[in-house]
Amino acid sequence: MMMQCLDGLKHLALILLTCCDADPPKVRQNPKDVARGTVFTVNEIEALYELFKSISKNGLIDKEQFQLVLFKMNTTRSLFADRVFDLFDTKNTGILDFEAFARSLSVFHPNAKFEDKIEFSFKLYDLNQQGYIKRQEVKQMVVRTLAESGMNLSDHVIESIIDKTFEEADTKLDGKIDKEEWRSLVLRHPSLLQNMSLQHLKDVTKTFPNFVFHTIVTDTPSELDG
């Protein structure tokens, strides 16, 4: 699902760019400033902004737009998409500006730090934001993910999967998985983060070749700036 999101992103952007007459609002943030908070280069940030303008309303996007663009879903709500959106909607307004949009994509960039991916994936599963993952939270994510992908497993099989997960991860035997235990589990099984990388984000300026860049910079990773 994650591997296909940029194709949907590009497709929707091209449609909207050809059918929308209104000029979107100018970006308030300096591209260099936005880039510093991400793994994107300044040129990539400008490409992303052109994309953002094509899908936003008044410089903002809501959860439905976010889900449609990133996950190619419209009628079926995705718990994963909801969680990603909510974690970047820090003010609980139900909308994201461009900077939050860029940061939400940055964590899925293949060049994002592995530790950042571990931390973010932990937050995705910590549905109640209690600082640990409970069995019911894991089951909720597994059940919803399977349903969204069209897979049907018996409750017995699902419970067995969760049992094995906790047997390995819950080393403190307290019925929950904390950040330390989650990190250890992921380090043993890196494939748990396979959905945390979007390969096409490495070539965002090539994916959207029609977008015009205005900032003249040396195209080096933004984290090296300033």
Swiss-Prot record:
Keywords, sorted A to Z: Lipoprotein, Membrane, Repeat, Vacuole
Q: Where in the cell is it found?
A: Vacuole membrane
- Record-annotated EF-hand domain positions: 20-75, 76-111, 113-148, 157-192
User: What Gene Ontology cellular component terms go with this record?
Assistant: cytosol; vacuolar membrane
A single GO BP annotation from the record? calcium-mediated signaling
Give any GO molecular function from the UniProt entry: calcium ion binding
* Xref: InterPro entries: CNBL1-10, EF-hand-dom_pair, EF_hand_dom
Q: Where is this site: Involved in dimerization?
A: S149
The entry's comment on post-translational modification says:
S-acylated by PAT10.
User: Is Hydrolase a UniProt keyword of this protein?
Assistant: no
Identify the PROSITE patterns for this entry.
EF_HAND_2
Query: Quaternary structure?
Result: Homodimer.
What is the protein named? Answer: Calcineurin B-like protein 6
Encoding gene per record: CBL6
